[in-house]
Amino acid sequence: MKNCVIVSAVRTAIGSFNGSLASTSAIDLGATVIKAAIERAKIDSQHVDEVIMGNVLQAGLGQNPARQALLKSGLAETVCGFTVNKVCGSGLKSVALAAQAIQAGQAQSIVAGGMENMSLAPYLLDAKARSGYRLGDGQVYDVILRDGLMCATHGYHMGITAENVAKEYGITREMQDELALHSQRKAAAAIESGAFTAEIVPVNVVTRKKTFVFSQDEFPKANSTAEALGALRPAFDKAGTVTAGNASGINDGAAALVIMEESAALAAGLTPLARIKSYASGGVPPALMGMGPVPATQKALQLAGLQLADIDLIEANEAFAAQFLAVGKNLGFDSEKVNVNGGAIALGHPIGASGARILVTLLHAMQARDKTLGLATLCIGGGQGIAMVIERLN
């Protein structure tokens, strides 16, 4: 089977809900990272076979957002593209699908990633609007909740699944708040030291009032304290432990990577950054969706012929502190190896982009620390997980 390599990896800075990127569509964010990934890879855009982009909140974006983004990036009309919706795993699944196509001999060069603007997600009228309301009130649905954050199986918020995990695995409020504080501190330190500079591409933001360049993550709370986190009320269950402070945010952003067949990359004189060793998904009960990374990671490690102890750095999406801690407890994560520059609790979670974002961040962290093996993994709403193992190439 053909080897797949990553030859470039970029992301936008992550915007807060209704923050700096609120006027920039997911398609424009996607176009920005697609163009930048190709430029960083130093490949001829004519050699791009396909573009695969994750995007969850597609309502109102128009046909096939990935195709729109690739055209806006300047790629030729002959380049095909498709959009992936695997909820929080969409961006990483896009990379896995790119690898599969290359391994199958269907392509040599694919741009893969994810894009999301949660700030611009619309509201929907219920189905009665199609046939007429006649009598009574209608209902308006929030696309963020309906298509992104509500469990379609059980009809409750993802936060309740985190409460379920906390109860099932004995994860206390204090443990969750401590993890959240560590995430905030690591992210603040990473921003201060410029650790994200190499992976972030600037976004030119144009509004009616001003034009500016957005290039730094704005969601982290650098001044967060244990006292402030402890004072927050539970967000989903009055007697619960999950709060706005120990959960990820609602955010905007995009990320993209150029994936190539290894021999083709070398023949073109390129220097691959990493080899994709394995990828896998796993299913769990929807009520405990946060545990999805456990079977996914176990499968990915088995396919790579590795043990968790072999992994040098891990990026595990912090959808909620409760699920992150339970996953780490179950798999036996070494806390010194995980989310070394902070995670989604601090940086944010633009759901369709996060899978690609954590892979981009993982790769750059491995480069900065001269590490060889990395693992990226996320839980997925509906009761799934996804994981990928990469090997950095010198």
From Swiss-Prot:
UniProt keyword annotations, A-Z: Acyltransferase, Cytoplasm, Fatty acid metabolism, Lipid metabolism, Transferase
GO molecular function: acetyl-CoA C-acetyltransferase activity; identical protein binding
Top-tier EC class: transferase
Gene Ontology terms describing biological process: acetoacetic acid catabolic process
Active site: 88 (acyl-thioester intermediate), 349 (proton acceptor), 379 (proton acceptor)
CDD domains hit by this protein: thiolase
EC number annotated for this UniProt entry: 2.3.1.9
Any Pfam family: Thiolase_N
Catalysis performed (reactions): 2 acetyl-CoA = acetoacetyl-CoA + CoA
Gene Ontology terms: cellular component: cytoplasm; protein-containing complex
Protein name: Acetyl-CoA acetyltransferase
